[in-house]
Amino acid sequence: SVGAGGLFMFFVVYGISVSALFSVPKNKIPYMILFSQLVDIIFMSVVFFRNKPIGEGYGKFFSVISSRWTFLITSFGIPFILSLLLFPEYIVVLFSVIIIAIILRLYLYKIFGGVNGDIVGASGEIGRMFALLLSTISIFLV
């Protein structure tokens, strides 16, 4: 079951994401979706790297994998390099979202002492939202 907080997050995150997509020229939408997906992967990998699992589930299983440097290279490095190569105009957005991910990670670890799969998934959606929002702002500033 989903609580009121989950429903609130759904409407806020997806409301902002859809608003950002409808605010840009139509020819930019596919690129923004691809960029936000790459940022989503980067965001989740920052939050999940060297995870201290809370509770049981897949998060505990994957925490063993996330403690390896190969995890960071494949889940952070590859999307990061692709983002820089495909979307050099969004470099400020990319670094801004990485800073937001680091801040969120520190906050989550302070509050919960670790993360589980639900928290990682929600953080990915938050990262996607910030990527779309900041990309939209950068389009109008350029």
Label the predicted regions.
Residues 1-10, 33-36, 40-75, 104-130:
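Interhelical loop and helix-boundary elements at the membrane-water interface
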Residues 1-26, 69-83, 125-131, 135-142:
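Multi-pass membrane catalytic core of lipid/isoprenoid biosynthesis enzymes
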Residues 23-33, 79-106:
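Transmembrane helix-loop-helix
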